[in-house]
């Protein structure tokens, strides 16, 4: 059964373009580590407008391997250092669960 990991982001004013570039860069790295599909959802309603980055994995085992391998990827470590130095967004929440319709 597929599993989904989401991160909701509050994008800083004037930084949407930068955030989108960062999402595309992160997606390239994430796909190399087993992510099957990636979605970026722009919410228009709710407590505040957010962009939610969703990673879809074929199963929990693949997600576990992803979590184990990411900290050792030098490109990911470099990307995170650069993105964290001048953030384009603030993390609002994260979630992880099974896709009951897969």
Residue ranges and their predicted role:
Residues 17, 61-63, 102:
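Residue-level signal for secondary-structure boundary sites
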Residues 47, 56-75:
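Glyoxalase I/VOC metalloenzyme domain signal
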Residues 4, 8, 33-52, 77-102:
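Glycine-rich beta-strand-turn "strand-cap" elements at beta-sheet edges
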Residues 15-40, 70-75, 79-83:
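Short amphipathic alpha-helical segments
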Residues 7, 19, 53, 63:
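Hydrophobic pocket/interface hotspot
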